[in-house]
Amino acid sequence: MEVENRPYPYMVSDANLLQQIKESSAEGLFKSFSLLLGKDVRESGVKFEALLGVYTNATQFVKFLETSLAVSCVNTEFKDLKRMTDGKIQFKINVPTIAHGDGRRPQKQKQFIIMKATNKHHIGAEIELSTQDLELLFLSKETPLDVTEYVGAVKTITSALQFGIDALERGLIDTVLTVKLRHAPPLFILKTLADPTYTERGLKKNVKSDLISMFKTHLVNNSFFLDKSEHLPHSRQYVLGILTEMIGAVCKETVFKGISTYSTANGQPISGVLETTDKVMRKLVNVIGQADNSIMGPAAYANYVVRGENLVTAISYGKAMRNFDHFMSKLVDNPTSNLDNDAVDTFESTGSIQKTPISTSVVMVGNKLIALESLQRMYNETQLPYPLNRRMHYTYYFPVGLHLPSPKYSTSMSVKGTENVLHQSVEAWIVNKNNTLQCFNYQNALKSICHPRMNSPILCARALGEAFPDVHNLNIYGIRSEDAHTMNLYQIVYDYYDNKHVAHVHSLAQKSMMTHEEVLHPTNHEILRTEVHPFFDVYAERHQGAAVQYRATHRNLSGNLPPPLAPYSFQECRGYQFEVASGLNHVIDSTTMEIIQETAFDPAYPLLCYIVESMIHGQEEKFVMNIPLIALCIQTYWNNSGRLAFINSFYMLKFICTHMGNGHISKDAYSCYRKIYGELIAIEQSLYRLAGHENVANENIGQLINAILDKDLLPPFAYNDIFTNLLRKSSRHPVVKIGMEEYDDDNDQQNCINIREKMEDLVGNMVNIYQQRNNTDHSRRYVLDVGELQENTYNSVLEKIFYYVLLPVCTNGHVCGMGVDFENVALTLTYNGPVFASAVNQDADILDHLENGTLRDVLVASEIRPTVGMIRRLCTSFLTCPFITQAARIKTDRDPGQNIVTHTDGKYVHQTVLVNGFAAFAIADKSRDAAHCLFYPVPFNKLYCDPMVAATLHPIVAEFITEIPSQRNAVVFNLPPRLIAEYEEWHKSPMSSYVSTCSQTPLSLSTMIAMHLKLSPVSFICQSRHKIHPGFALTAVRTDEVVAEHIMYSSKASTSVFIGQPTVHRKEVRSDAVVFDINHELASLDTALGYSSTIVPAHAAAITTDMGIHCQDLFAMFPSEAYSNQQLNEYIKQKIGSDRVYGMPLRDPREYMGGNRRVTLPGLSHGQLATCEVIMTPVTADITYFQSSNSPRGRASCVVSCDAYNNESAEKFLYDHSLPDPCYEFRSTINPWASQIGSLGDVFFNSQHRQMAGPTLYSPCKQFFNKEAILKNNKLFYTLVTEYVNRLTGAPATSNTDFQYVVINGTDVFLEQPCQFLQEAYPTLSASHRALLDEYMSHKTTHAPVHVNQYLVEEVAPMKRLLKVGNKTVY
């Protein structure tokens, strides 16, 4: 049949199937070409455009009526829509009341006046028709070939027309869907705000707080419900429950009442429509079943096609309306009228409009029939994103290296083999998106924690100065040492403690004496204020006439971390790790260490031992001379008490082991000395094994790893010229301050150092020595008297291990520096008749010949009976003894990894070396009178300043600690500033605090060695390689992206769509074609009395990031920043894998731009790398904090309960640590290094410091630290909650009320980036030990969140993953 013989569309009287409209309209259009235009289509373009407009009117909304989306819409013709600029419709709603019979006053009638605003939309399409094809339509068809060409032209033009018309049809659907989404808040918002428990209480602070809590709960519980249902025993009931909540959360009241547009075949109304994706639709049908496969929709559209001029159909509750005026008269002015009775007026003598079946899925939810539809295919065909597919961003966090406090316990009955309480975790096991177990450890984080910016206090100090310019009660004690104008140590000590009635306790000591709970309590916020950086001690000072300035000095050693943030049990775990990593096998045992402790606390320790030690003063020749006396002292004391004499001196220990192994003393005693010395050697070898053999920056790498191996740290006691040796070998510009003189050049040795040679070489110089001893003012003689250093046998490492590790640990710090009055000692020994009386036999017991005096009292108290010859030889040793005990103040540059400072003095580290002094134990009461004449206390080092020992050496110290009893603790004991200033020292209060409480076990020695590991990048590299904890934990933060498939519910007839007249005009006329633009004006009006739609994530289609362990490379982000030593900088970058790109010039501009200089990986295995950033965190951070959603800052950031426009109040909420954390009222924070103003985390991620420290690349942490963004989000959140509550609480409205039930600004961010909005990250599945994760993956009903010192954190997030390892799955 020829095409022209088909019936014309405008002669058709009726059509029941919607699809027939397109076919009939298209066929009739071609006949109209010849009737109206003739052969040349370009001659009558206006008529053709009008005809094309008629065609588009006739076919535009057919496909829309076939969709289930139309269930929720009402369509109305509005020819003058293009003239409308601001369309509004006002509705009056009467509020019903309840009449009470208890005498209450009747309520007045209330009326809501709701103003509904329309929103205009524009859709357009382009149609291109070939001129040649149009001309073929009018050629005579004389041959079969002509007919074939004619049919081909018809098909071509039909295809072009179909393309344009389909675009308009899809445009309408897309517009309506977009309008619906604009009126569809997330379910977790509507569900919360619809709860009368909250809405009836008013919008107070406590109510807002409750609302936020419920937002969080519903967000986690309701999101991705289809995924969660797959692993629930009653999945169908769970899914139906969520769908029921969606239906119940929306408003079912509209301005139209009573009649349903769409229904089932048996007449049951369709209550609404669920729009979703193909996959979600299939899953829903599979889970809850399908109640029907079609619905009955209006078919009246065809009737209007044949009526000529009225080509736009307005469908409202199954009826067609002529125009907008008719809409106003019937639905607005008289909305309760029965439209069925008005059918004659409406349709001009036409009865009820006909309906046609439309194929769609219908599900039964409760007692309601809901249409279920997916429009995804339409978007897939057009290669456009589907609005119900959204990208969600969730930020996860997990801890690395936390230490669980005692008592240890376990919640597992199956995990075995990890019961060792000393096993400290240095890693976190996580599961990535492909269920691959991955280990995040400190080696992953080296690219961040080794960067210069992480090791800099400059920004912290600057931010503190800006935030706290006024500081009351400034502390000056311990900040800076004073120059000693005298070499007389006795005078220095006496002047300091004489008439001293006030004790100062700086924050270092205060923190060392506090518990973890105390230091984080809001009442201690002033102490906590300066705890802003794990590597630095910060203090405030004010110079005369200047403002307050904040300074920072490096903590040097991991043992100097405050005990509340790095407790002793944790340090012992590090000691155990050191043993394992270095292969240390202790030679010493607990019994020997207890003997040393008993010796230190022995009130009967022989005073004669100190006299002998002072006469020998570290000189081997004098030791050899006096071996018989020394052996007598050792053996007598061992026999009397079972304790060890001379154990307070390294040189005495060394000489005893060297020269007294041939029977001078008992085998048992000698064995103890050998064990002690053997322990020193074992520790030394373990240190070298740990450090390795590399050289960095012209230094052995061990110097940058452990302070014991650092040649710039000298032993605390010196008897030989170790100072010149330091000047010759150190590259850190050491300066030896000798009183008022500075010795910084080894060429000045003769002016600053007096080398006392061996006695046999000084026979001819004895007179000069005697004259110098008696005629010189030694208080003003700035020269050190020391022996010659034997460099080939000198081993400072063994000496430092003894003085800084073994002796403090074994004595519990019950030891103090002691000065000697050599003149009085000599008088005590020599001014006795038997000593040099030739009549007395040298083998005679001297006590048999001594008269009453100091020496007799000393010998009697010591219970030692030397011979006359022994005392004579001891007196001979005095001939070349030093004149006085002296002190030298050593200043050196810090190592190149620790020299980023806030002020010039901070570049230096200081220590005091006691020259020809000794370490003393407490003096017994019976010996004190004699001791006070011979010795005096010199508290010069935090490990050698026990006030109880010092009090036994001089009554002035005893008076001081008696008057101020708190000063009896070595941690807080005030020390002379001419000898020590704690902020400048190598050893600080935390190490003193540890030794005072540690047990006498070999582990304590390992712990003290581990505490000497440096807080420096090279040390971190070494420790991470050997799995030794660096002293601080990490909070790893990662943002992952999820493609989520949503489901939207919309109630019936909740949106009115106004359709204007289409406009067709020629866009372009060419010789080969004519291009037409078809534009259509649309407007939408929400007709519901509340929110009629809601949306919820139903299924996670894909996780686009790997959820892995890739850590941020700060060397790539800030390539221009480097350590001052270039060799060190290159070494660090090479070791951590952040080298410069090969072949790129050092000064290439790309080096300073950050983003383009890195070489990307050749390929990816698990998808886009999700970058982890690390926040330094105290190891004592509460593990329960990480088991729920919280701010990675360590303190709550969401301040929506505050006044939205009171920034001061909001900032106090964020940063004022005198206020408790609103989420955890018993503390201010869990991480002072990140939550406080000026803390490392704050200055690093806060955009306020962007010009100096804000990462220029992607930073998942920035959203939690950027103050401006936080306050902005909080205001937005406040507004969001307020706006939603105003719309849903039913507050009376006025004629000025213009509440539009639309999605409030920020809702999309809330839904898609909830972590940014709520300022919280979600915990991801992680475990400190793989065993706990393996148990968790065993899919048992119980698992072990805590096991001794190990922990597991479960994943609590909106998206719940199915985890699978091997054949084991757990959800």
From Swiss-Prot:
GO CC, one annotated term: T=16 icosahedral viral capsid
Keyword terms: Capsid protein, Host nucleus, T=16 icosahedral capsid protein, Virion
Pfam families reported for this sequence: Herpes_MCP (PF03122)
Keyword field contains Signal: no
Superkingdom, taxonomy of origin: Viruses
Places the protein is found: Virion; Host nucleus
Recorded GO MF terms: structural molecule activity
Subunit-structure text: Homomultimer. Makes the hexons and eleven out of twelve pentons. Interacts with triplex proteins 1/TRX1 and 2/TRX2; adjacent capsomers are linked together in groups of three by triplexes, heterotrimeric complexes composed of one molecule of TRX1 and two molecules of TRX2. Interacts with scaffold protein; this interaction allows efficient MCP transport to the host nucleus. Interacts with capsid vertex component 2/CVC2. Interacts with the small capsomere-interacting protein/SCP.
Family: Belongs to the herpesviridae major capsid protein family.
Function statement: Self-assembles to form an icosahedral capsid with a T=16 symmetry, about 200 nm in diameter, and consisting of 150 hexons and 12 pentons (total of 162 capsomers). Hexons form the edges and faces of the capsid and are each composed of six MCP molecules. In contrast, one penton is found at each of the 12 vertices. Eleven of the pentons are MCP pentamers, while the last vertex is occupied by the portal complex.
Protein name per Swiss-Prot or TrEMBL: Major capsid protein
Species in which this protein is naturally found: Saimiriine herpesvirus 2 (strain 11) (SaHV-2)
